[in-house]
Amino acid sequence: MCESYSRSLLRVSVAQICQALGWDSVQLSACHLLTDVLQRYLQQLGRGCHRYSELYGRTDPILDDVGEAFQLMGVNLHELEDYIHNIEPVTFPHQIPSFPVSKNNVLQFPQPGSKDAEERKDYIPDYLPPIVSSQEEEEEEQVPTDGGTSAEAMQVPLEEDDEMEEEEVINDENFLGKRPLDSPEVEEMPSMKRPRLLSTKGDSLDVVLLEAREPLSSINPQKTPPVLSPVRVQDRADLAPPSPQPPMLAPFAKSQLPIAKPLETKSFTPKTKTKASSPGQKTKSPKAALSPARLGSPIRSPKTIPKEKKSPGRSKSPKSPKSPKIVAHVPQTPVRPETPNRTPSAMVVEKTVKETIPVMKPTQTPPEVVKLNIEMQPKKPVVTDKTIDDSIDAVIARACAEREPDPFEFSSGSESEGDTFTSPKRISGSECATPKASTSSNNFTKSLATPLPLSSGTSSSDNSWTMDASIDEVVRKAKLGAPSNMPPTFPYISSPSISPPTPEPLHKGYEEKAKLPSSVDVKKKLKKELKTKLKKKEKQRDRERERERNKERSKEKDKMREREKEKEAGKELKYPWRELMKDEDSDPYKFKIKEFEDIDAAKVRLKDGIVRREREKHKDKKKDRERSKREKDKRERERLKEKNREDKIKAPPTQLVLPPKEMALPLFSPSAVRVPAMLPAFSPMLPEKLFEEKEKPKEKERKKDKKEKKKKKEKEKEKEKKEREREKERREREKREKEKEKHKHEKIKVEPVIPAPSPVIPRLTLRVGAGQDKIVISKVVPAPEAKPAPSLNRPKTPPPAPVPIPVRVSPTPLQPPLLTQAAVCPALMPSPAPALSGIGSAKAPVRSVVTETVSTYVIRDEWGNQIWICPGCNKPDDGSPMIGCDDCDDWYHWPCVGIMAAPPEEMQWFCPKCANKIKKDKKHKKRKHRAH
């Protein structure tokens, strides 16, 4: 009543405005369109005002909110003011009652002298109504049938439904003739109440499940167009009360109702919906059973919806001339029983279930429908989950895209949705593309212009078309002989773009819906499915966790096995160097890589061993300790071997004998002196002792004692060798010193004393061996000035080289490969070559030559000072901390080698080049050892 009344008033207003502008007459089609536009315009204006008032924290809008709403709609307030002043005011044709309209007091507050007032407890405030008596409760229970707040209230007796359908068919046809001009919205306007029906329709069930909507009536009661036929009016009267049940619930009931009829005759199922689609569509083919979206105008199929709402059993749906057949089946409509199940609470439950599991959608279908749905569910439940989610995402995305506010674009679909602005163009494009499927889905989402709405028409349980479904539909169409896809003929004159093509036939959807089980069964099944899904997920999680645990266990087992193997190998090896030869993985990095590879292989194999792990954990710890000790021992032994070899090589070359005065001087020049002759043998032993002290577990003291004894023996042997070598060196030195004294006396007599070397004196550098060493020939200052203090400690910043030192020669490695093997690099030690050159230079009366073997990265400046160059950055020593390689004696800046803090003194450090060479040498040794 409200819709028809408001629309009639708007029509009068349109006529008055036209008269004021000078028009004498108006075509009915134009009048209907203008009325529809005015209605939408006022609705959007009201929405804008309300939203602005809420935005600023007000419950009631004020003029400022109205002004903001006008601006949002593109209306200039100044122009509007001028228009009002320049045009005579149009009086309203009817007197409008002042709101709120006076009503009888239904609260029944007790009068002061009544019994209720006397019996009323003191603690009950006066503003609370009295407790309802049992009689009143009984009366109230009867009210819902009239109120239509629940699905039951909306239902009509089956007998009436049959009659209603016949009447509706007639009315629709008549209506087409009578009001071809009604804009789709006019029919759609009832969508306020009908949107629920649409959603409830089997076709729209999926959509409904996907997105919950508020009934259009609750949003815009005025929006629905006046009832076109008496039957519809009655339906509206029934539907008018539709309480704000969750839109989802109502749609389910609706869907079930239409399904009940199709159950009896699947071929007719489309009929119910075809009528709703449009008068043209209704006549065309019940087979086309347009999805609720199709029903009514493309934007919204409100007419169809209200029709369906009129008969919850859907008996009323006169969607096609064949609807009388449906009427025959109407008595079957067990839809009513379903509708009672859809009380607000039940509907809410269904709504939640549907949201969680789209397959459950048909919960509210009638028993017959339930059966059909039961058949259909096993096929489509899986598909629906994914497809529904995808469709929902698509719908949401499209809705977001379409929600750009455009004050001038109006769409009934958007109004039903509650979207203030949606352009008709959008509606026409998307809705036409998805023939009215979006309209059916409008109850849930305006943007349901995606293929989902269409699919919803085809099957509520299926959101996506399958090959089988499409084939079945084609066959059905052929049997029915009615083109389901015939374009609907719209008598309405609405925006031409809005008239949508008829959607694909809903036959399959109806059949599937009919197959759906009863709401109770469906709920149970849904709950079971949810539980099973949750259980499956939990099982999967547990499995994944177990797999991860197994992987970790397998890794630990692999590590344990490797450690055990290493222990066994260590026990079998009598000599440490053999152990080194056999261990290809002496490099800790390589060892780690192997562990990971083994672990990867073992992950697949090992799944047991929880008990073993606990036992092996302790073993692992012990093995790790033993490993580290073994590796350290191996390294130390290698170093000792290399040192011994170097010493042997160094010993044979003859050394110059220094005079007794200079006996205290080190054998090597300060640049080359990193470690005194006695130190190389002992230096490697220090780290061993330190590491041993740190890692001594009580259990392994015995093993350590044995190792220490072996080490002591080796040390003693080395000491003896060194002492012998020293004695030889001393003898040679004495001989050389004697010769040097003779030469020096001659030089002193001939040469004047030179206070400092002149920068002009040329220097010669000769490369020796593999380019590691250079022979630097420079001028020598007289002996008296040469008494520099020997520097035994390696400086972090290389020390300046003292210039005046008599000719000194010390052994250097004979073969460049040995340099890489040596634990202590002899690279900076003077080479034997200088001895000869020194002797030869003694003959020269003026100058003597000092030869020193200097690293390629050490330079002497004009005054003879040594400057270290970092091989990493090729920049000289700038005072920043540097670290020297224990093999080649090249000095690197810390940042160039990635060192942040100084390493411990006991620990040897090798540059990248030397480290690689040592690794290669170790491998080579191992190969040789194996060959033997």
UniProtKB/Swiss-Prot annotation:
Residues 130-201, 213-347, 403-465, 480-579, 607-657, 681-746 are annotated as: Disordered. The modification N6-acetyllysine is found at residues 266, 779. It comes from the Eukaryota. Residues 524-538, 703-714 have a biased composition (Basic residues). One of its GO terms (molecular function) is p53 binding. Keywords: Acetylation, Isopeptide bond, Metal-binding, Nucleus, Phosphoprotein, Transcription, Transcription regulation, Ubl conjugation, Zinc, Zinc-finger. Residues 158-171 have a biased composition (Acidic residues). It is found in: Nucleus. Gene3D superfamilies: Histone, subunit A (1.10.20.10), Zinc/RING finger domain, C3HC4 (zinc finger) (3.30.40.10). One of its GO terms (cellular component) is nucleus. The TFIID basal transcription factor complex plays a major role in the initiation of RNA polymerase II (Pol II)-dependent transcription. TFIID recognizes and binds promoters with or without a TATA box via its subunit TBP, a TATA-box-binding protein, and promotes assembly of the pre-initiation complex (PIC). The TFIID complex consists of TBP and TBP-associated factors (TAFs), including TAF1, TAF2, TAF3, TAF4, TAF5, TAF6, TAF7, TAF8, TAF9, TAF10, TAF11, TAF12 and TAF13. The TFIID complex structure can be divided into 3 modules TFIID-A, TFIID-B, and TFIID-C. Belongs to the TAF3 family. The PHD-type zinc finger mediates binding to histone H3 methyllysine at position 4 (H3K4me3). This is Transcription initiation factor TFIID subunit 3. The lineage of its organism: Eukaryota, Metazoa, Chordata, Craniata, Vertebrata.
